[in-house]
């Protein structure tokens, strides 16, 4: 999500990265790996998708389309973008509140339990980007427009604390299993940590941190 020079200097090369992400690294359910194999070949889907990375891929596809103006390219990629976003909605926003509530892996190598400003804002922009692409291709995007409005409202009314966007830590009211049982990245719960969980919530959450 951070590299912005390559798509402007070598746009055709950058678009091949989207081809790999969506055509090789994404399975039929819409799950996308965040590390593809070299040489390029099919990969296993046996760990979490990265919320910021997968949603960011939709933003990058939108950016690459705007830079290139290649309508044929984006039209062919569009069904895979929809498949990716629908996976994200189903996995992290199943109640369709407009925020990523279920535990979502991210670039910090942790799972955020409950909505955070970083990933939920990328979610909002992915909804916006896919809506714009869909409209340009003549598709009905009302579903994504509705979710986008909910997302912006959630960010402004529930995550913004007057100074910055904080995280709303959630774990008891989610579909995900107990944090001590959920698959995570090199994280286990000692007996002491289990006691802290009842008071403070899952490990490594940002909460009111900035």
Where are these regions (language model features)?
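Substrate-binding groove/exosite segments of carbohydrate-active enzymes
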Residues: 1-90, 101-105, 195-210
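Catalytic cores of carbohydrate-active enzymes
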Residues: 92-118, 122-210
């Amino acid at each position: 999500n951070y590299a912005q020079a390559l798509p402007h200097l070598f746009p055709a090369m950058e678009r091949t990265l989207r081809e790999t992400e969506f055509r090789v690294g994404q399975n039929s359910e819409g799950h996308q790996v965040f590390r593809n194999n070299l040489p390029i070949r099919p990969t296993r889907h046996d760990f979490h998708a990265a919320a910021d990375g997968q949603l960011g891929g939709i933003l990058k596809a939108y950016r690459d389309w705007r830079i290139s103006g290649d309508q044929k390219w984006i039209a062919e990629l569009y069904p895979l973008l929809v498949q990716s976003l629908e996976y994200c909605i189903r996995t992290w926003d199943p109640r369709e509140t407009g925020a990523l509530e279920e535990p979502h892996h991210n670039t910090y190598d942790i799972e955020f339990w409950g909505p955070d400003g970083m990933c939920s804002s990328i979610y909002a922009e992915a909804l916006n980007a896919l809506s714009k692409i869909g409209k340009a291709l003549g598709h009905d995007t009302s579903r994504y427009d509705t979710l986008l409005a909910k997302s912006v409202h959630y960010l402004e009314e529930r995550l913004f604390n007057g100074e910055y966007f904080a995280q709303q830590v959630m774990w008891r009211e989610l579909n995900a299993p107990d944090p001590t049982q959920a698959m995570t990245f090199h994280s286990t719960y000692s007996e002491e940590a289990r006691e802290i969980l009842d008071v403070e919530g899952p490990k490594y959450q940002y909460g009111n941190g900035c």
